[in-house]
């Protein structure tokens, strides 16, 4: 099976050309904007599943402003990606609470909402390290302080070969703290 201790899976083989830079990116921050049907969420879901299978000590946190919106958005996209990649039997799916577990290693994709900030503190994974955060519909996060607190969810040093990454996906906007931080005044390690 591709991606499991063999040749890496390639998004371009599954989803079309033009995604290689996105797939390979290891910037600390990725800021991905696009209109409806731009494939940003589907591409992110495919990459997430592939990365979990390729990095056996990595785990991911998936966030939206409201926890209740995750099931029909990110969670559904990740289930689609698992099916599309043909690895359904390798994943355990929990719907209450939302949780995806990669069975061969015990790695997790954890889901949280910013509407319950206490559930964002002290997130612990069963195996490895929490390395990556995906913030879907990031424009809904209207308070930059909420994002700063989210950044604290990935703490400490990571073992060699792993990297910290925050990916913000959203539809285009006019005025938002995201534009100011990552486009207008950024000196951070950002993939735009």
Give the label of every model feature segment.
Residues 1-192:
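Phosphate/NTP-binding elements of NTP-utilizing enzymes
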């Amino acid at each position: 099976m591709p991606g499991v201790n063999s040749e890496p899976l390639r998004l371009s083989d599954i989803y079309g050309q033009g995604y290689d830079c996105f797939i390979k990116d290891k910037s600390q921050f990725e800021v991905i904007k696009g209109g409806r049907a731009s494939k940003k969420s589907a591409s992110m879901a495919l990459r997430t599943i592939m990365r979990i299978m390729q990095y056996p000590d990595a785990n991911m946190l998936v966030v939206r402003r409201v926890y209740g919106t995750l099931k029909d958005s990110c969670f559904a996209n990740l289930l689609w990606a698992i099916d599309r990649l043909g690895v359904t039997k390798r994943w355990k799916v929990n719907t209450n609470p939302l949780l995806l577990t990669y069975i061969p290693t015990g790695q997790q994709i954890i889901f949280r909402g910013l509407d319950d900030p206490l559930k964002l503190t002290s997130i612990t994974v069963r195996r490895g390290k929490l390395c990556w955060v995906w913030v879907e519909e990031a424009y809904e996060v209207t308070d930059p302080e909420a994002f700063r607190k989210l950044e604290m969810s990935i703490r400490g040093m990571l073992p060699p070969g792993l990297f910290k990454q925050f990916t913000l996906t959203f539809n285009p906007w006019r005025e938002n703290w995201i534009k100011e931080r990552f486009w207008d005044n950024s000196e951070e390690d950002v993939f735009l």
